[in-house]
């Protein structure tokens, strides 16, 4: 089986896991990224089942995302160009303007408006924007790394406790509605999992194993190596352990769901310079990009590993595992 066939099969399994079939016309890159967007929306507390959604944008990715949202249970999904008439200005003004696609197709307009913004080398859909409009900005990998650090800083800046910050995040992301207690609790738990399991994963040869071992020593957590066949057994029982997920775990949606439901997961990426076109290792870069969307859809953060496991482990500990639980000292 070729790498492309393996990649396609994994995509199909993930689509099936979320309750639908991938549209035949969608190219693999769009299919993969759309699945990542859908998983990201789900993880961030968006509940689109039974909701009307209008995607402000066109193209193969918009079509792939629409198909994914329909498979995920949205009551109706329309796609169209963005303009001033279709974008609500505030959370209380969710509406479709007369004559636009959303209003004509879905009476009363859409419950959610998703605006797409492009970027080269897409790696992740990032949720931004004011209440009432969800901006999905597709960012380059380097931007993802920087923004993750900024978010960790935001959660602790100004002496704000993470509980208050998490509630504020939920209010901004449950668009146009009052946040339900269960949705608040879900996000709060995700930011306050200091005693739960931590999983480290990455592609073979990129240093994830060495980073996981260093992080295990740093956090004084028992180290557990997990393969595709023993995920459920490994995650059963006590919490507070550190897991190294072998590469094959990403091919099993049920295994990934177990990982997501039991703790936090970080993805160890190779040095970004090795992934640039015209430099580094082209074969390695192609292999990395082929599975990037699948990993980032289920991992909380991505960290660039530049060769020193202790340094990478320290960065993960400082801005991801420790910082969100501490009040910033003046």
Regions inferred by a protein language model and the residue ranges of each:
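Conserved substrate/cofactor phosphate-moiety recognition/catalytic segment
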Residues: 206-239
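N-terminal ligand-binding/catalytic initiation module
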Residues: 1-25
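Rossmann-fold NAD(P)-binding glycine/threonine-rich loop
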Residues: 13, 129-173
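NAD(P)-binding Rossmann-fold cofactor-contacting core
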Residues: 72-94
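Glycine-rich phosphate-binding loop used to anchor ATP phosphates in small-molecule kinases
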Residues: 228-264, 268-269
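NTP-dependent small-molecule kinase module
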Residues: 176, 180-198, 210-214, 293-330
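A glycine- and Lys/Arg-enriched "phosphate-lid" helix/loop adjacent to the NTP-binding pocket
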Residues: 261-294, 301
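Glycine-rich adenosine-cofactor-binding loop
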Residues: 31, 49-74, 81-82
């Amino acid at each position: 089986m070729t790498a492309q066939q393996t990649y396609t099969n994994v995509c199909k399994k993930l689509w099936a896991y979320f309750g639908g079939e991938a549209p035949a016309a969608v190219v693999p890159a769009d299919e993969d990224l759309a699945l990542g967007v859908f998983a990201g929306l789900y993880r961030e507390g968006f509940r689109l089942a039974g909701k009307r959604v209008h995607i402000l944008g066109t193209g193969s990715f918009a079509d792939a995302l629409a198909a994914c949202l329909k498979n995920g249970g949205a009551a109706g999904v329309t796609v169209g160009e963005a303009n001033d008439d279709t974008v609500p200005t505030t959370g209380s003004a969710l509406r479709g303007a007369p004559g636009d696609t959303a209003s004509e197709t879905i009476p009363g307009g859409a419950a959610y408006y998703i605006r797409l913004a492009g970027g080269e080398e897409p790696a992740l859909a990032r949720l931004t924007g004011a209440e009432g409009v969800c901006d999905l900005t597709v960012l380059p990998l380097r931007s993802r790394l920087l923004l993750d650090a900024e978010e960790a800083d935001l959660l602790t800046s100004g002496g704000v406790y993470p509980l208050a910050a998490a509630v504020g995040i939920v209010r901004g992301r449950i668009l146009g509605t009052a946040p339900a207690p269960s949705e608040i609790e879900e996000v709060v738990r995700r930011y306050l999992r200091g005693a739960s399991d931590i999983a480290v994963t990455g592609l073979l040869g990129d240093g994830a194993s060495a980073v996981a071992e260093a992080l295990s020593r740093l956090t004084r957590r028992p180290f557990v190596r997990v393969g595709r066949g023993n995920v459920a057994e490994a995650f059963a029982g006590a919490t507070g352990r550190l897991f190294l997920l072998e590469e094959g775990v990403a091919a099993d949606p049920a295994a990934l769901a177990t990982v997501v439901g039991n703790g936090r997961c970080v993805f160890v990426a190779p040095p970004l310079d090795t992934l640039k076109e015209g430099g580094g290792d082209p074969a390695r870069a192609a292999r990395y990009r082929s599975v990037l969307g699948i990993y980032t859809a289920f991992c909380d953060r991505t960290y660039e590993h530049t060769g020193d496991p202790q340094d990478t482990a320290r960065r993960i500990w400082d801005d991801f595992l420790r910082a969100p639980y501490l009040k910033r000292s003046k």
